[in-house]
Amino acid sequence: GSLDDSLGWYNMGINLLNEGKNEEALSSFEKAIGGCPSSEVELRVKAQNGRGNALYNEGRYPESIVAYHTAIGLDPKSVSGRTLFNMGSSYAAVEMFDDAIKCFSQSLERGLDKSEAELCEKQISRCRVLAREQAKRQARSIR
């Protein structure tokens, strides 16, 4: 595989994602990753994020978390606020609220635009409420 091929697959994946064609996008991102030279870390990170987004859109939350973790692991210093926000959303979807709150909080530190930051604050508040309710339910089920 070449960098040009991988870029082509990545761009196709983005277009398919924007059209709501998540399965096709997923396939394109996987082809981009498969053929991408290991030295092209930035493209690999972006393609893993794309995979995460496509998986999230398909309701495949645990798999999306793995994709986001892979992206972060490739280049921890360059992690965007949006990646952390998306991973937080995946954690919230599987009711792992403490992990979601950590991701949302870190995403604020990594830079989000104003509307994203406001949404992030709302998500943190929502997850805190849900985490408390979850803890109460678990405490009741133990008795």
What do the PLM-derived regions correspond to, one by one?
Residues 106-143:
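Terminal, low-structured helical/coil segments at or just beyond the last alpha-helical repeat
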